[in-house]
């Protein structure tokens, strides 16, 4: 459990909050690149870290991420005209470039220099690995982009998506680093996944529902291991890297680690009661096939809000007969099972009422890292992890191995290039 004070500390992410300032030290995904795929295409609303922004790609292909509200009379720039290397407010014609400079002010006299005195809030934005990334922190601490696996492969080798999840981002992360729940929440598979080679470990996760858990801190966050009993004096190991501030790589697949398809999620706060679940799948050795990738990439979403069609308003499509006869939940899709349960805890979970057990080792480790990071910032200590971009070249592990192979030996296999 957490105290109410600590719970508030890690869950509140607006400007000026300790957690919000910590997250702003990192490059974070704001939207998918294909949402603004063409120069001069329509701008897109973006809400991250409790800030309402608008993203656009200008005539030259450069990306702008601006305050949604024009500094003149606060009209929304979502309705603006994206033309001739700038976003123009349709209320009075003020126009802003990707750096936030006002480059045209047709409502003022031609001889006026007023436009030279007006700027709009603009954040550095980069097109990287299928996402538009934003840096929202102090300029003097801007790091290099993280070398995440899906960004290090050609476009055809990856798939990315995002959708809205209606709970605080911490709940999403806690689900992503909890290996124990797969033996229950995801017990039984929808037919489309029953023969999927990425789920060959399913039998082992179902037959041993109380695995042994270990955590090791790393330069990028930590790696979390769970081993389950397997045949022939072996363990089934699942190792999940947690990359600060909110990324995971899900254990799965089989065969040569360099040939596998990997998937993961990142949970980016929209505000304190909702988050964006970014999903990525990639294969370093070949292009992804049609239909390949995490099931979250294929969920039906409301086109304007990016909210899943199966949501709390329709109880996530739960089918009690399927629950009775086929799956543990009666809810279709692993991703909807996850988001449904995470949203059921409330917008911000009351962690003062929890009772954590040994299976919650990774959750406890993540909270400790967050709390310490917030306290360090309050004391003026800057985080070092954002400057460790090359440390993010990691992947998950899901393999049956001899009992003699230790957790420490297994953690070395998380680094890309180690068999």
Regions found by a protein language model. Give the residues of each.
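Generic N-terminal leader segments that precede the first folded domain
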Residues: 28-30
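Short, flexible, glycine/charge-rich loop motifs used to bind or transfer phosphoryl groups or to couple energy/partner
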Residues: 18, 77, 162
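Alpha-helical interaction segments
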Residues: 16-17, 81, 86, 306
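C-terminal catalytic domain of Rieske-type non-heme iron oxygenases
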Residues: 15, 37-38, 62, 139-419
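Rieske [2Fe-2S] iron-sulfur-binding domain
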Residues: 1, 11, 32-159, 212, ...
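A generic structural signal for short, non-catalytic loop/turn and secondary-structure boundary residues
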Residues: 21-23, 48, 118, 127, ...
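A boundary/linker detector
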Residues: 1-24
